[in-house]
């Protein structure tokens, strides 16, 4: 028979495990200064200095990347895709703590997720939510529509480009925008992997999922 003490012990162990997972993801979280005003987030995609972020975070300015250990580097823009709002940067650093990338094809509505970023300039904040919907968004580019992840994990300016991670601490999306004040939108990790692969940096790659039916 399971008693109240057993439940409390299990809850405590689960909380400790989740906190440890989040700390590991935070080590791969960076701050990206690309626009004249403000900053966004990004993730270390590859240990050799590849940084993935949002295209709108980079803007037209020379981007700078601030690592979790407070080292800052001027970054080189190696690829960008405004339609899916992603940009790939390279910094002159090695042996970095790269993020673990999950296959967003297996993501389910209702799944627990965490959003990491620097809301309002506060570094390394974590918020929690669930996957609200797996849908598509219309674009003005050649794709016409792109898959998106909608979540109720609270986002704010400074979260853009940061990771959306699952309960295992692996990245399943890149936080991109806020809709209606209470819904976040993220680009799925498989689409991010395709973007990186098309740029010639293909260490992480997952297959495309079937298009979702819901359209926003």
Residue ranges and their predicted role:
Residues 12-20, 28-48, 71-74, 100, ...:
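A conserved glycine-rich beta-strand in the N-terminal activation segment of trypsin-fold
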Residues 60-77, 94, 108-114, 123-137, ...:
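Beta-strand/loop subdomains of soluble extracytoplasmic proteins
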Residues 20-21, 43, 76-78, 94-123, ...:
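Active-site substrate-binding loop(s) of clan PA
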Residues 1-22, 75, 115, 119, ...:
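C-terminal cap/linker of serine protease catalytic domains
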Residues 26-28, 87, 91-100, 125-203, ...:
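Active-site region of chymotrypsin-like
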Residues 1-2, 37, 46-86, 91-94, ...:
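Catalytic-histidine neighborhood of serine endopeptidases
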Residues 35, 54-56, 112, 118-119, ...:
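Short, surface-exposed secondary-structure boundary micro-motifs
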Residues 45-46, 57-59, 101, 107, ...:
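Short, well-ordered loop/turn sites that connect or cap secondary structure elements
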